[in-house]
Amino acid sequence: MKKFLLLLFASALFASAAELRTIKDMDGAEVKIPAKVERIAALWHSNNQILLALGGADKIVATTDNISKNAWFLKIYPRLAQIPVLLKNNDVNLEELMSRNPDVVIVSTALAGENLAKQGFTVLKASFSDYEQMRRSIRMCGDMLGGDAPQRAKDLISNLDKNIALVSGRTANLSPDKRPRVLHIVGGSDLLKIDGKGTLIDSWIELAGGTNAITATKGPMKTITAEEIIASNPQIIIVGGDHNEDAVEKIKSSPIYSGTDAVKNGRVYGNPRGVFNWDRYGADTVLQILWAAKTIQPELFADIDIKAETKAFYKKFMNYELSDAEFGYILKGLNPEGK
């Protein structure tokens, strides 16, 4: 009887081990996840769109406040309205998260991952700060999802690489004096919050033929002084967030910006915003590369049809046919009803 129980225990352990597989997250940590992942708590805003692009949105059982408020995500993926919001203002509802019983929790910071791992959750850090890291993160998510997701990940990366190659082929040899100073403001609600060096935003600015106007500040969403902005004298200003036309007018009338070359020469632009903000860390950055290139170096990219590229991308990866009007709303940072 004792031998039988030992054999039974050993077989249970073997079966348990056989049901797990190992995957590396963005910190290089080897994480054991179920052989078939069915329930994902997507607690990094932009990763929700990556999962959608890879065909894995049906596995999301918890999302974030940022995503729940995105009217484009809801339009394209109506089930979003039924998914609990368990990350609000960067705080996780642990009790509710436990009740959702996720196979994997996706996070953006090591600290968040450590805290959740201590509570017994299986955690994958998915965040990235440049395009090479983004490729790794997309592959990781494809591997995690399984099924046809790895192939969709390859397709998404291929699309990214195609646009990078197209743009870099025309901008790589630009001399410094041909690269305008570009300031990227996170959103219209705070005109002093910018994105510095060492960010994905900095990557697409450089790729598109510009240079970051703010060189002394590193990292995303950093608050700087009005004096720093005035001293940097950006030649182009790009502002993210929704209702970007309102933000552009706010910048033009701001005493901080009125003396900059960007305002004087009419080169203040609102960044497109669709299922995720194009300028940030979602799948739409594939389109951002082209839009930024046309915006920063219009003479070099007059042949690029952003509308056609956007429609094709949304059809393939968002499974949605954009109308001409909807494309126009995305460019202006408006919702699907044009508001």
Go through each PLM region and give its residues:
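Short helix-initiation/N-cap motifs at beta->coil->alpha
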Residues: 26-28, 83-95, 217-226
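Extracytoplasmic substrate-binding proteins
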Residues: 113-191, 214-216, 267-334, 338
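A ligand-binding cleft/hinge motif common to bilobed small-molecule-binding domains
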Residues: 111-119, 240-254
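A short, structured surface patch at a secondary-structure boundary
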Residues: 41-100, 104, 109
